[in-house]
């Protein structure tokens, strides 16, 4: 059965993943998913849209694209583009109006957004990838797990080791010898030296 009401299709094309969310007219999420794109953005987006179609059937959609990798595709597809901080702050203001601070970890950057009296202020670390999604993935792969696996390790930690927090390169330099000594599940609850 075809549904002719207009649905919102949000597309976020980041440096490492493509994410989509399909909402009905009442802003209920009908479908959401993400996949790593491995520099194959169009194919990954097609795969996600196919999954959404398989779950929801034929729908009329109003798409919008955001994300660091989305501008070129938005122009190519003639779909509206919304800068990602505006997209995040607009969504949070609507869906979680009590929010005063939001932290977004991207694949290669980290952003913090402050909400104060109707004003939105954003700061971004785009210089170093330490603490971003890619860095977390790299650290997880060192101990042959994923980001979810890191959560499981953190739940059962037994010791805390100081790890450099200033830079991802220094953190990895601290982490690798600890892993080599067998300290796998002990690392991911470790604060930086200034927190210890």
What are these regions (language model features)?
Residues 1-84:
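N-terminal glycine/serine-rich phosphate-binding loop of ATP-dependent small-molecule kinases
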Residues 2-3, 69-121:
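Conserved phosphate-binding catalytic cores of ATP/NTP-utilizing and phosphoryl-transfer enzymes
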Residues 19, 62-68, 105-115, 168-176:
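Acidic-glycine-rich active-site phosphate/pyrophosphate-binding loop
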Residues 35-39, 85-91, 126-133:
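Short, acidic/turn-prone active-site loops that include or flank metal/cofactor-
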Residues 37, 49-57, 96-103, 140-147, ...:
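Structural signal for hydrophobic packing residues in well-ordered secondary-structure cores
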Residues 120-155, 159:
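Glycine-rich phosphate-binding loop plus the immediately following alpha-helix
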Residues 154-187:
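A mobile "lid/hinge" subdomain adjacent to the ATP/sugar-phosphate binding pocket shared
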Residues 188-196:
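Single conserved hydrophobic/aromatic residue that forms the stacking wall/gate
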